[in-house]
Amino acid sequence: MSIRTEKVASLLQQELGMILEKEFPRGGPILTVVEVKVTADLGIAKVYVSVIGSAKEQADTIEYLQQEKKNIRKILSSKIRHHFRRIPELEFYQDRLYEKADRIEQLLKEVRKEQE
């Protein structure tokens, strides 16, 4: 990634985090914007979110974000329009890094128990 795309991704991550917290409060699972990856032409922003909750809550939250992405983009545009000529299209994905890390930790604990 170039320096520009990194700066854009960082700005989008901060703003989207605030938007999701303030403009779209939902009771239920905790939602965190973990990472944003922007294409070189700044046309698409892939937003990776971490959802802490049951599997159904996670799926419902991602589905909700996909349905609301036009509204989220509109709010984002009103907040950062002076930075961009065109606001990137948003694509939401669930970040599964924490689940993978938890699984690795469980496996390591099992190995340690077997060695004792």
From Swiss-Prot:
Subcellular location(s) of the protein: Cytoplasm
Any one cellular-component term (Gene Ontology): cytosol
Coiled coil: none
GO BP annotations listed: maturation of SSU-rRNA
Keywords: Cytoplasm, Ribosome biogenesis
Role summary: One of several proteins that assist in the late maturation steps of the functional core of the 30S ribosomal subunit. Associates with free 30S ribosomal subunits (but not with 30S subunits that are part of 70S ribosomes or polysomes). Required for efficient processing of 16S rRNA. May interact with the 5'-terminal helix region of 16S rRNA.
Subunit and partners: Monomer. Binds 30S ribosomal subunits, but not 50S ribosomal subunits or 70S ribosomes.
NCBIfam families, per the entry: rbfA
Protein name in the entry: Ribosome-binding factor A
Organism: Chlorobium phaeobacteroides (strain DSM 266 / SMG 266 / 2430)
Gene name for this UniProt entry: rbfA
